Amino acid sequence: CGPCFTTDPYTESKCATCCGGRGKCVGPQCLCNRI
């Protein structure tokens, strides 16, 4: 998965939903890791 970009307060949750895995947030960029 590529990174998801969001300014949402629930960035990690949105990233996990987008990617179907876990989300790690680094500033405004959320990196998705599939499990």
UniProtKB/Swiss-Prot annotation:
Subcellular localization, as worded in the UniProt entry: Secreted
Pfam assignment, any one: Toxin_5
GO terms assigned for molecular function: chloride channel regulator activity; toxin activity
Keyword set includes Disulfide bond: yes
Superkingdom to which the source organism belongs: Eukaryota
InterPro entries: Scorpion_toxin-like_sf, Scorpion_toxinS_Cl_inh
Gene Ontology terms: cellular component: extracellular region
Chief location of this protein within or outside the cell: secreted
Record flagged with keyword Secreted: yes
Known tissue expression: Expressed by the venom gland.
Keywords attached to this entry: Chloride channel impairing toxin, Disulfide bond, Ion channel impairing toxin, Knottin, Secreted, Toxin, Voltage-gated chloride channel impairing toxin
Disulfide pattern: 1-18, 4-25, 15-30, 19-32
Annotated domain remarks: The presence of a 'disulfide through disulfide knot' structurally defines this protein as a knottin.
Protein role: Toxin with unknown function in healthy organisms. On glioma cells, interacts with chloride channels (probably ClC-3/CLCN3) and MMP2 at the surface of glioma cells. This complex is then internalized via caveolae, thus inhibiting the chloride channels necessary for cell shrinkage and tumor propagation.
Recorded family membership: Belongs to the short scorpion toxin superfamily. Chloride channel inhibitor family.
Protein name: Peptide P2
UniProt source species: Androctonus mauritanicus mauritanicus
Lineage of the species this protein comes from: Eukaryota, Metazoa, Ecdysozoa, Arthropoda, Chelicerata
